[in-house]
Amino acid sequence: MAVAQADPGSDPAGGARFFCTAGRGLEPFLMREVRARLEATQVEYISGKVFFTTCSDLPSMKKLKSAERLFVLIKKQLPIAVSSLHKGKILNEMQRFVNDDPGSWLEAISLWKKLLEHDPKREKVSQRDANPLKRKAGENETIIAKKLKVEEKQEVAKDHGESQEDKLLQGSPEQGEAVTRTELQDHRLNSTTEKAADAQDQEDLTFRVSCRCTGNVRKVITGQEAGRVIGLALMRQFGWKADLRNPNIEIFMHLSDAYSVVGIPLLRMPLASRTYIQTAGLRSTIAWAMASIAEIKAGALVLDPMCGLGTILVEAAEEWPDVFYMGADMSDAQLLGACDNLKAAGLTDRIELLKSSVTDLPLPSQSTDVIISDIPFGKKFKLGKDIKSILQEMERVLRVGGAMVLLLSEDHHRHLTDCGGSSIPLTSKGHIAEPEMKTLSNPDRTGAPDTASPSQRASSVQCLGRMRPCGSLVPVESFKVSLGKTDAFICKYKKAQASGLSSAECHEPGAHTEMAAMQESPSLQDSL
């Protein structure tokens, strides 16, 4: 994976803070990727988000493959203590996101503008149909309502002729606002920072707020209420204007029981929406994550024996070009879709498609270096005999020492685990890989992450040593990931010698050293 060098003229001096959202379970892949691709430092994580510092420019950050969305970080802090505060106090605490440190907002806006100005393929984030934050039905997240614009006009009329300080002191009883003299002093102290910004640009800025509330926060305050409070605070503090339909900028806020995060999306479309994939099958971030641990090397033959629309092959070929790829499937419709994807991506010369059953591949034994595949989730293949015959055929065509990465449903994963033999050590010290990242249980602590208790490990760590699915296939590591409505497991195996090469010899400790290093990385709470 090549490290992208940033244009010296576009680097944030000394590095800037960003965060990416990620599918649950993909945090370790994203942490490793930002370090390798962006030379990122201060890499931290929480469930679904990875924070990092980098000097990379926007074109470099656009190359991230395991991330969903990319944001400039404005603020991250401990959660609002909703259980100990009444609603008015909670709303007042939310105003402090803006009022306590307006300089951080101006710095983030300045960075956002700078990154977009230096992007050769600049996106217009203010397009009418732009919606940089995908919303799911049923989630409590909203944009500032039209009422915000009405209130803005009312306040302008009411406060005409009053000083900015008088405006800051006037709160709305409906929202439980209570701006204090201390906050006013903070505003004065930060006035030098505000003056340093381009005043005209700030006044002309239009915005909207997208707020997501989860956990207990959701029970006390709605996303709409939170968005209104932040929106009004921004209008009073900076003179910005709310624009629901065509804003210059969108502010994203997530309030949960574990953290409060505020940021600015850098791109209109998600990073996970690949421009080179015409018809999506498996989610591209999952496909890339699978390929990233498959030990693909130049000159290798990589096979997906159940390729479907070819997403895994396309993702791998985009990242590792000097490799020959082959995809097989029994469905004519799937192969036609895969062919369209290959043409759209310009990869027809490097990926060959053939119609074949996964249980009867037209390939010589030990002819394949890497196998990567998404095993159908019980819709086409039954547990037991079918999955066993599939794995036996994959084992046959995979060379000794070759890697196999499979995406397994929970049922398939459980079946292979239950059918496994005795425990097999994966390293000389008997270590196994943990499928899920762990965060601190105590958000007030700093330093090294807490060590999981035996009961926690028992519930989260699958005994990979028991997952010896077939003959010479030895388990290496496993990661539990979310596919949206369901969960799955990314499982990696290596093929041992038929004569009995031990799993410890087959296993490469470097992979676990890397994962262990990521698991020791600080969580969000370490830096709060």
UniProtKB/Swiss-Prot annotation:
Q: Does the keyword Nucleus feature in the UniProt annotation?
A: yes
Provide any one GO MF term from the record: U6 snRNA (guanine-N(2))-methyltransferase activity
Catalysed reaction(s)?
guanosine in U6 snRNA + S-adenosyl-L-methionine = N(2)-methylguanosine in U6 snRNA + S-adenosyl-L-homocysteine + H(+)
The residue ranges flagged as biased composition, category Basic and acidic residues, are 154-168
> Which GO terms are recorded in the biological process aspect for this UniProt protein?
methylation; regulation of alternative mRNA splicing, via spliceosome; RNA processing
Enzyme class name: transferase
Q: Which residues form the THUMP domain?
A: 162-266
Q: Which GO terms describe its cellular component?
A: nucleus; tRNA methyltransferase complex
The record's section on PROSITE patterns has: THUMP (PS51165)
Broad class of the protein's primary localization: nucleus
Positions of region (Disordered): 154-200, 437-460
State the similarity comment: Belongs to the methyltransferase superfamily.
According to its UniProt entry, the function of this protein is described as: Catalytic subunit of the THUMPD2-TRM112 methyltransferase complex, that specifically mediates the S-adenosyl-L-methionine-dependent N(2)-methylation of guanosine nucleotides, most probably at position 72 (m2G72), in the U6snRNA of the major spliceosome. This modification in the U6 snRNA affects the constitutive splicing efficiency of introns that have suboptimal splice sites and can impact final mRNA levels.
Question: What is the protein name stated in its UniProt record?
Answer: U6 snRNA (guanine-N(2))-methyltransferase THUMPD2
Q: From which lineage does this chain's organism come?
A: Eukaryota, Metazoa, Chordata, Craniata, Vertebrata
**Primary gene name:** Thumpd2
